[in-house]
Curated annotation (Swiss-Prot):
The keyword Repeat applies. SASP are proteins degraded in the first minutes of spore germination and provide amino acids for both new protein synthesis and metabolism. These proteins may be involved in dormant spore's high resistance to UV light. This is Small, acid-soluble spore protein gamma-type. It comes from Priestia megaterium. The record marks 32-33, 67-68 as: Cleavage.
């Protein structure tokens, strides 16, 4: 029995199978989860997550400045810094020859 071109021993057309596989794989990826996923809902969730991330970043950035605000008097700190600088200047004058 002569072997026919492009056919397997069982008589299956290899070209036909290749075409079917190519068609199936081309369409399969987009529709595999199509019934399970609402694209609009996912986009909305992604936008909400991005907004929350931005909000959290802003909140933590602002939080650093206000974390100790109730405990620290800026005027008092300036006064202490001025006193420390004055003492430093006095001490450096004593030891110069």
């Amino acid at each position: 029995m002569a072997k026919q071109t492009n056919k397997t021993a069982s008589g299956t057309s290899t070209q036909h199978v290749k075409q079917q596989n190519a068609q199936a794989s081309k369409n399969n990826f987009g529709t595999e989860f199509g019934s399970e996923t609402n694209v609009q809902e996912v986009k909305q969730q992604n936008a909400q997550a991005a907004a929350n991330k931005s909000q959290n970043a802003q909140a933590s950035k602002n939080n650093f400045g206000t974390e100790f605000a109730s405990e620290t008097s800026a005027q008092e700190v300036r006064q202490q810094n001025a006193q420390a600088q004055a003492k430093k200047n006095q001490n450096s004058g004593k030891y110069q020859g």
